[in-house]
Amino acid sequence: GITQNPSKLNPISGAEANAARRKVILQAMYEQGYITKEEQEEALADDVYARIQNVDTALKENETPYSYYTDELISQVTEALKEQLGYTDTQASNLLFSGGLQIYTPQDPQIQAIVDEEVNNPANYDAARYSVEYRLSLTHPDGETQHYSQETLKTWIQQVKGQSGFDGLFNSEEEAQTAIDEYRTALTQDGSTVLGESVTMILEPQTSFVLIEQSTGYVKAINGGRGQKTANRTLNRATDSLRQPGSTFKVISSFAPALDACGATLSTVYYDGPYSSGEKEFRNWWGSDYKGYHTIRDGITYSMNIVALRCMADTVTPQLGVEYAERLGITSLVSQDQTLSTALGGLTKGVSNLELTNAFAAIANGGTYTKPIFFTKILDRNGKILIDNEPETRQALKDSTAYLLTSAMQDVMQSNTMYTRSGSGVKSTGTTAAIPNMSCAGKSGTTTSNVDVWFVGFTPYYTAGIWGGCDNNQPLKGGTVSNGGTSYHKRIWRNIMTRVHESLSDPGFTVPDSIETAEVCRKSGKLPVSGVCSSDPRGTAVYTEYFAKGTVPTETCDHHTRVTICSASGGISTAFCPTNQQISKTVMVVPEDGGETDDSRFSMPSECKIHNGSSTIIHPSESA
């Protein structure tokens, strides 16, 4: 509940009373076993009031709230002072706010301004709705105190106002305030009095954005939320919020380890057909139809769920998938994430935008992971270096793996249509984010019920990630719901990156010496059979693929075969079929239990049932 008499116990204006109360609480916590004697004494020795006064003084000197970047910078510097110099919380805070430190940051003011402008530009959004953070405390006539929140407000609107479909979002601030006023009036009709009330309006859908220079690890800009920032150290959606990453995680947890450690190539194929694990059935994002054999390249380009799942199940294992995500800097995973769902970004806690974007920055940096850098050095008031923040790097992926993933993610952002029968192709998922006159690669992500949307991508210069969604997990679209749709974030990513790269030339992505090319069949991932793979009824299945040196396949395609068909029946020709009705045709060899797929439509037919060699009985009347 809310602290009794909070103004009297204000740690700034009522520090003495607060200290007495603090002492009582710490003693009670010790007596009830919540803390040890040593922890009690350590807490009592902490000069917390000096720290609070310093922060309060700093805030009063600068009435404009800190930016999201500064908020995170404060956290990073505080942790560095504690970890590297052994300072306590109090000492680090005192030094930071009143010690005259000189802190050098790689933030780019021009890029930061572009990010802030685009994230807050109403023209970039298809909706403007509002959620509320609401707190109300009442004293009832019988003297009892009761507390209310946005959740009780939502229930009241649904049940008392009869709006059963109300999802917690309002169409305007005025509409939200009217509902709050009506709610308060209803609650105080019995003579209850208001002890305290706070209302914060939050613009929805929300957004966070991170931009990193992958070659250095320098964080050039972040934005932790759409709308005016009204206070310091508020929720930073770029660094603090853990959200489900959706299909962006296919690259990190399934395809990256498959290529890097498991002998797979971009041409390795998995069968896109009905798939279940335990009691859970999986589907592709486009619906219930399946496409048959498809490569890892296709799995990335068209964000194919079944291909990613089979890759993790058959090649990688969930354990290795989690290990690779952690190698790429994801720190929020737990043991329960060692499941197939991780391949699709179904995580226990989720990930932060900062860590997800930096994982892709490692791919953009040739496989070298660099811990994100918010400051380069800290000097004391006399100019002496306290901390020289050297980059922490490690080789997370082979340079060949990084390039292969980059090449496939370039296809995501180019206009491509899946290799299928006419009229059933799926489009590449990132074309909306493509920026003009600059090489770019990236991956989209959308979570169940369209709750979260992501796009993380990079150029030869910068890696950027954007998250979109509602703070309280309302769907962005679905049925009659329209809370911003599922594409606005890609437009914002494109707008920001286009402006950031305006004066930069396009050097392209460097192909490392560890890469070679070869022609393969896209339906087997193996060397094509001359005249067979190229004559698939859907068009040639032969294409040129990149490989890590030494991994070009040596076997020939075993998913295509050439057969003779009877044109009269469409079946395999028999010895009895007329020669002039026999044609040669390429067909697919598919799994017997693979279900109905695009490939099964072109699979081996049964024998001709018209010309089967059966004896024909001719009656006398018929021969007359």
Regions found by a protein language model. Give the residues of each.
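Extracytoplasmic/secreted proteins, especially bacterial periplasmic and envelope-associated proteins
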Residues: 1, 17-30, 42, 64, ...
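Non-catalytic, structured segments within soluble enzyme domains
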Residues: 1-121, 125-150, 326, 331-332, ...
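Structured segments of extracytoplasmic/periplasmic soluble domains
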Residues: 2-6, 12, 25-33, 43-46, ...
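Second-shell loop/turn segments in exported
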Residues: 6-16, 25-26, 30, 54-62, ...
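Mid-domain, small-residue-enriched loop/turn segments at the edges of structured enzyme/sensor domains
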Residues: 281-285, 315-358
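Low-complexity, Gly/Ser/Thr/Pro-rich intrinsically disordered linker/tail segments
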Residues: 518-623
